[in-house]
Amino acid sequence: MYAIIETGGKQYRVEEGSKIVVEKLAAQAGSEISLDKVLMVGGAECKVGAPYLAGAAVTAEVVDHGRGPKIKVFKRWRRNDSRKMRGHRQDFTTIRVKSING
């Protein structure tokens, strides 16, 4: 059985026991979360929501939090000899899917 969920503005295809990296969630590492924005549940019988399935949920465990690689943003203006350098690191959360209900 698999499900397509939405979290952080992105969609993920998950199965029981799978580990995925999503946008940062406000939950402690080791805690259990419920993702209720389920778009589709597939398996022997496929159910599709419009846009979400009512009563469907995916239970997952927060494995850990981390930060992605540093992205450098460089802006330069001609004639002024002006430039600006900024860096950014995106926060993420790794979760492990425990069960799919729906």
Swiss-Prot record:
InterPro entries: bL21-like (IPR028909), bL21-like_sf (IPR036164), Ribosomal_bL21 (IPR001787). Pfam families: Ribosomal_L21p. One of its GO terms (molecular function) is structural constituent of ribosome. One of its GO terms (biological process) is translation. It comes from the Bacteria. Keywords: Ribonucleoprotein, Ribosomal protein, RNA-binding, rRNA-binding. GO terms for cellular component: cytoplasm; ribonucleoprotein complex; ribosome. The keyword Cell division does not apply. Part of the 50S ribosomal subunit. Contacts protein L20. This protein binds to 23S rRNA in the presence of protein L20. HAMAP family: Ribosomal_bL21. Belongs to the bacterial ribosomal protein bL21 family. This is Large ribosomal subunit protein bL21.
